[in-house]
Amino acid sequence: MTSTVQRAATTRHAYFHDSDAPVATVVVPAAFVAVRWRGGRLLLVRRVESGAWEFPGGRVVVGESAEEAAVRCTARAAGVKVLITGLVGLFTDPAHVVRSEDGEVQQQFAALFHARAVGGEPHGDARETSEAAWVAVADLRGLPMEPAVSSWITEALSFDPLPHLG
């Protein structure tokens, strides 16, 4: 399944179990958080380059743990300070690749954590995220979202005591 969201002059393509997907040239470690708020709403961000909604997070940089990256990236991209409370899972499916706007083809390798908000108000950073919001589960269907992210949301909402692996 291919997900292409075009905004302005940039295009980002996400492929999820798509026979037309390009071959990845790099594995990109990333960390994201699933934060639930009153009424079961989820913290989501809207990416500037694709227009798609996803959990806040980003790349793990040299010298930091996945948990540190998740906390850092969530504060930057969503304006919310979080405390990691558990692991939803590791999402390492080699059939999930993204061709970024610069042409790099990345195999996704993502850690998704449960977290709770401990400060801040949702807002985009205007560089990577145009918006951040608490979104009701009932409103998720109408949002532009990559297929892999939809599966991550399903896992995050399942409250399975065993983390997803794969």
Located regions from the model:
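Acidic, metal-coordinating catalytic segment for phosphate/diphosphate chemistry
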Residues: 2-32, 103
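Conserved Nudix-box catalytic region and its N-terminal flanking loop in Nudix hydrolases
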Residues: 37-77
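Short, solvent-exposed loop/turn segments at secondary-structure junctions
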Residues: 25, 52-53, 91-97
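A short coil-to-beta-strand element that immediately follows conserved catalytic motifs
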Residues: 81-91
